[in-house]
Amino acid sequence: MEQIRRYLQLERFQQHDFLYPXFFQEYIYVFAHGRGFSRSIWSENENTGYDNKSSLRVMKRLITRMYQQNNFIILPNDFNKKNPFLAKKKFFYSQIIAEGFAFIVEIPFSLRFISYLEGKKKIVKSQNLRSIHSIFPFLEDNFSHLNFVLDILILHPVHVEILVQILRYWVKDASSLHLLRFFLNKYWNSLITPNKASSSLSKKNKRLFVFLYNSHVGGYESSFVFIRNQSSHLGSTPFGVLLERIYFYGKIERLVNVFVKVKDFRTNLWFVKEPYIHYIRYQRKWILASKGTFLFVKKWKCYLIIFWQWHFSLWFYPRRIYINQLSNHYFEFLGYLSNLRMTPSVVRSQSLENTFIINNAIKKIDNFVPIISMIASLAKAKFCNVFGHPISKPVRADLSDSNIIDQFGCICRKFFHYYSGSSKKKSLYRIKYILRLACARTLARKHKSTVRTFLKRLGSELLEEFLLSEEDVLFLTFPKASSSLQGVYRSRIWYLDIIYINDLVDHKYKL
């Protein structure tokens, strides 16, 4: 870190929040191009091959060409076919600049975070922190008491100026913002909808897109969190003066005194405040869950539409917000389909000569495997067709049979481990059938034989990789220490492998 700070002279630029000179340092693009986008921006790279002096020639020439309209004129659609060399040169320029932008715009955030960590002598422990393994138990404990879910599709920025305005609150350097605005206006269409010539550009600029997207969504969340915490006064306050809280707490105290002092109206403040809302941001969606009534949830939907249109100048379509009742609809989260199921329970009670039969409905969260989207992912990866029929997958000729079987078995084990908390395993068995038969057809294709002949020759060796021990994988067994019965019980667990969670959560897009 000290080496990178010395190369880039960040202390001098940080004093005035001035990042524009960093665009002309060749080391920026060396670090950005060589560090890999999955690593931190402060990862040191010893094999850069440059000395401690910054070179201005390369980037000055490139920046100068960007401002020359003759080199970046609007070209017809068939220009890339007629002049492939100039087209690749143009995308090469934008790729270099995008890598540098992705590196530079993170500097203010990273320096602020590093200075915060250096100032902290002791890490404060918090009891409210939860790992990813507690997400689904949290849903089982809390969502069973909720009624409605707002499924919101996050807005995309309609114009690049919105992204620049959001970054203006963090980056005080006007020159850097002007250069970023120029770059986004010039290459926005090619970056969002790349063609074959620029397909590699969008993959390498993923970090820049993620940073801009999180900055865009963070502007909504910073306002929304405050509104959610102060939601008890939204019912009687006009949206034009929403943040005005004059006499608000005085009115609440007055209501409390009335309810507490009058014996007939003794109650809690809970009846005055509106129901609490659980908030989750997942991929491109917001999930708001509440135990309020349908009128309360509909009021939140109308308010959110007005809030985004007035405070963020964005036209928000009402059809992007879905009001779903948990007992009738599923909501997708972390690769699972969750649903609130009502389980009837009959309790018989006898008091002296009277017998009472009480019918109770117990709410329980059910989590299912999204079999349709999983089959679509398997079909995209050439394991089956769109109807779920297994097909042979082309493999390299140098792979041995054991390696092929191990690859198919590893995919099957990942699915069973990740979806171990599913309420029903029928969908998992169908996935195992598809992978097992696809593996057999792949091996038969390699040996130029039929599946039946190959299975007879191979025997039961092929099935061993797919026959998982459900006692070890799907359940854990714990002794009942507090019970008088010396027995054991089984409970559903959540085996969320953090290493593979991204691949399985995003199975709609990749396998």
Curated annotation (Swiss-Prot):
InterPro entries reported in the protein's UniProt record: Domain_X, Maturase_MatK, Maturase_MatK_N
UniProt cross-references to Pfam families, sorted A to Z: Intron_maturas2 (PF01348), MatK_N (PF01824)
Disulfides per UniProt: none
Compartments, as annotated in UniProt: Plastid
GO CC terms in record: chloroplast
A Gene Ontology BP annotation from the UniProt entry: mRNA processing
Record-level Gene Ontology MF annotations: RNA binding
Keyword Lyase belongs to the record: no
Coiled coil: none
Keywords annotated in UniProt: mRNA processing, Plastid, RNA-binding, tRNA processing
Keyword field contains Plastid: yes
Main subcellular localisation: plastid
Function text: Usually encoded in the trnK tRNA gene intron. Probably assists in splicing its own and other chloroplast group II introns.
Family of the protein in this entry: Belongs to the intron maturase 2 family. MatK subfamily.
Listed name of the protein: Maturase K
Species assigned in the record: Lathraea clandestina
